[in-house]
Amino acid sequence: VGGPGIVPRGGRQVVTALPARGEVWWCELPEAGRRPVVVLSRDAAIPRLRRALIGPCTTRIRGIPTEVRLEPGDDPVPRVSAVNLDAVESVAIATLVERLGRLGDERMHQICEAIEVAVGCRP
């Protein structure tokens, strides 16, 4: 079955960890394929909705205010990439297939600032 939540195993169900805000996961996106994403949803919403708001990562780095650059070693990503906050979307948590790690507080602060720009709350 894959992904977090309740996974059947040998006639019984095993609860696996849910994603949490600030974590980076491999995600199976229908249009973009498998790519790392950053979970943006507040933790309380994820188990209720069974969905998470995510920011997809891309290796096409444009250096614009709605992106946050991620670096292997500093961040849990396999390659230098950027979180694209112009492409935020809600996905079923079943599409989150493998946890890569958690971003630090400073990186999440940068992401919050980029979201403000992406939605027009800050120029």
Where on the chain are the PLM-derived regions?
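Conserved functional hotspots at enzyme active or ligand-binding sites that engage polyanionic ligands
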Residues: V1-P123
